[in-house]
Amino acid sequence: MKRFVIGILAHVDAGKTTMSEAILYETGKLKKMGRVDNRDAFLDTFALERARGITIFSKQAVFPLGDTFVTLLDTPGHVDFSAEMERTLQVLDYAVLIVSGADGVQGHTETLWRLLRRYRIPVFIFVNKMDQKGTDRDAVLASLKERLDHGVVDFSGVIGNEDVLTFSASAEPFAAVCRDPEEAAEEIATCDEVLLEAYLADGTLKTDDVRKVIHDRKLFPCFFGSALKLSGVREFLTALGEFATCPDYTKDFGA
């Protein structure tokens, strides 16, 4: 049975717990999404968390993703509980960094990024709250590249369910409109020298090679949407299932 562990991280009020709820709902683990402001979020189990509307303790849930079981860890977003968040990083295979499309990259976002770099954790990025007025998708993406890493790439419409990467127009309302497949492929290829050489040789990107570049923290897939409205969540989950790799544990691995 294949398994891997993801952690949901964010600056405060980016919608981290709402994203966790959306993931569990979309994968059939919840019949109804809870809301932080309604004090009925599934993963906010302590009375103090529900009263204050913040996550204080890391929580765990397991959901199916194709033929893989994914363990999700919802971590505190408030800077006062950073020690609790950092404690979970040591067990993660991948991190999902939530950024508010309304607020953009915050100081705490950069702190989280430095911690993820220190622990060498591969990262998927979800830009949330894109349904709010005044959000600028291109500006947020440019800020992510400038303040976090130039390897942050918009993965709207990128498909990895075949041996070779393919591209299609995304149906998500906050995805890029009419992206040029060749331009998208080149942006991915330039994140790694070996990947670029292979792409220049035959004009294709092998999906396994892209998975490796993501795992090696040279490429950071980025998605846009609204967790509260379930926009972009399904596309993100599909990509997570296609591009995340399960760790190889030996038979004698255990606590």
Describe each model-derived feature in a short phrase.
Residues 1-255:
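Structural and coupling elements of P-loop NTPases
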